[in-house]
Design a protein with these regions (language model features):
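Bacterial N-terminal signal peptides that target proteins for export
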Residues: 1-12
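N-terminal metal-binding scaffold of metallo-dependent hydrolase/deaminase domains
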Residues: 8-9, 26-28
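Bacterial N-terminal signal peptides
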Residues: 10-20
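Metal-cofactor-binding active-site regions of metalloenzymes
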Residues: 27-527
Length: 527
């Protein structure tokens, strides 16, 4: 009987010794583990503390961001004042389009924007009309309708302000530790193409239709758009003093563009835009530093042409991809909710965007569970690595979809890659940090979860070049860059060659080094 008691005594002593070491082991966290713990402490301290923590977290990029909707109303009004644009005080929009008129040229029914500082009430009304600020849903004025109406209110300013607008968005991104933007934009020249579009005979095939457009000079229009973007970007970088001894923080943000096609139009106008967008992006991607890196279709998905011609639009893209096989496509699909359209309209948009149009990414994807065979679709998206651009605030204010009604948890459960994005941060009066906080508070996303979203935003970006990673779980880097990955050391040799050849890999290494600095700083705070 003595042997068991002796063993028990030895086990007790061993347990005491182990317990003495547990606190020290618990404190021996990796920088990532400590950062995750710090985020949980911030979460427990409340929304403001969580926001402060997330503001400094590296976020990679914003992949779903409309340039016109990203600019805050105050900027548009300041530019309108500079140009002495006339404002209709009843309709709350710009009435003088194009070239800036002389001071005092507004008629008695309109107001010169330069006088707005003396008209605070009108100024406030304009900000509210240009955005979701102070919006309260009412009969005849839903969040959906108010949101999309904002674009008609602030449309019409001179395109010469575009470098300033991009600078504003890039500066805001830099302040939140973002490093990459894919901004959706419709060039002014596209509106001329739309106006000149003519009907074609019903028997004309897509290839012949495309050739007719090219023969009519659409290729020259594409060149003009690319040259204009070159000028805009040069002006922006000069304004930000990029490449000088005192660059603005916005210079640290890599900016690329998605050609934005307006889809709520007759088929000939949509087709001509898609061809033009493909022409622009294909030529740009073949250059040494492309600005346009992909294509998207925009405007409300529930609008008349958007719904009636949805399958037709997917077929147009599919037919044209044979001519432009290297141009990536992301599509707004599933930005719908029950009641907004008939039930039949919820059953196929996401699937057709992927299976017909060949979209590599999906914007919104809110109605995925109303699609035919939704679980099959989720599994297919995971297998194909189709990323969903998640816009939480936008889905809330436009569709009324939030919390348990949002498919974000389902996408994550089925391993469909996601990346948080803003959609129209100026209209919604938010930023990407707000979306990270919303995801953390609403869906209990942890630091590793948010870190994966940030990594996804670069991995699934349309930046050209080879990925830094050999897997989609971010565990196996390219061997040549393994040493540089988790340090602040400058890449050399074969790794440096990879980064030079691949803008994507360069941005991925930059993100990892930002995580390294952020997490080590978080760990240092505990000592």
């Amino acid at each position: 009987m003595q042997a068991p008691r002796s063993c028990l005594t030895q086990l007790t002593l061993l347990l005491v010794v182990l317990l003495q070491f547990l606190p020290a082991q618990a404190q021996a966290r990796t920088p990532e583990q400590q950062t995750a713990a710090n985020m949980e402490q911030a979460r427990a301290a409340g929304s403001l503390a969580l926001r402060a923590f997330l503001a400094g977290m590296p976020k990679g990029g914003d992949l779903h961001n409309h340039l016109s909707g990203a600019v805050y109303a105050e900027t548009f009004l300041r530019d309108a004042a500079t140009d002495h644009v006339c404002i209709d005080p009843k309709a709350l929009d710009f009435v003088r389009r194009g070239a800036a008129p002389a001071t005092g040229s507004c008629d008695t029914n309109s107001v010169d924007a330069s006088t707005l500082p003396q008209k605070q009430s009108l100024y406030d009304q304009l900000v509210d009309a240009f955005s979701m600020r102070s919006f309260v849903p009412s009969s005849g004025d839903s969040g959906h309708d108010h949101f999309f109406a904002t674009f008609d209110h602030f449309t019409g300013l001179s395109d010469s302000h575009k470098p300033e607008w991009v600078d504003e968005v890039a500066a805001r991104a830099a302040a939140q530790n973002e490093q990459y933007l894919e901004l959706m934009d419709t060039p002014d020249a596209a509106f001329g193409i739309i106006a000149q579009t003519k009907p074609v005979s019903s028997g004309t095939g897509y290839a012949a239709w495309r050739q007719q457009l090219l023969d009519a000079g659409l290729g020259q229009q594409a060149l003009a758009i690319r040259q204009q973007m070159d000028r805009f970007e040069q002006t922006r970088r000069q304004q930000e003093r990029c490449g000088t001894a005192q660059p603005e923080p916005a210079c640290t943000v890599e900016v690329r563009y998605l050609y934005q096609v307006l889809r709520n139009m007759p088929p000939p106008a949509v087709f001509a835009q898609i061809v033009l967008g493909f022409e622009v992006a294909a030529a740009d991607l073949a250059s040494t530093h492309p600005h346009y890196v992909g294509l998207n279709l925009v405007q409300p998905e529930d609008a008349e042409y958007s719904m009636a011609d949805y399958t037709l639009h997917m077929q147009m893209i599919a037919a044209l991809r044979q001519f432009y096989p290297h141009v990536p496509v992301t599509l707004h699909a599933g930005e719908l909710a029950p009641g907004l359209v008939p039930p039949e309209g919820l059953r196929f948009h996401i699937r057709q965007a992927i299976e017909i149009a060949g979209a590599q990414r999906i914007g919104h994807g809110v109605d995925v569970m109303y699609e035919d065979r939704p679980y099959e679709l989720l599994k297919s998206m995971a297998e194909r690595h189709i990323l969903v651009e998640i816009n939480l605030t936008s889905n809330d204010v436009i569709l009324g979809i939030r919390g348990k009604d949002h498919p974000l948890p389902l996408y994550r459960r089925y391993d469909v890659p996601i990346a948080l994005s803003t959609d129209d941060e100026g209209v919604s009066r938010i930023d990407l940090t707000h979306e990270y906080a919303m995801a953390a508070e609403t869906f209990d996303l942890t630091y590793p979860d948010l870190k994966k979203s940030a990594r996804n935003s670069i991995e699934y970006s349309f930046l050209p070049g080879q990925s830094l990673w050999r897997d989609h779980d971010y565990r196996r880097p390219q061997t040549v860059c393994a040493t540089s990955l988790n340090s602040n050391q400058e890449a050399v040799g074969a790794c440096a060659a990879l980064l030079t050849a691949s803008p994507k890999a360069a941005q991925q290494l930059e993100l990892e080094q930002r995580f390294h600095r952020f997490e080590h700083a978080q760990q240092a705070q505990q000592h």
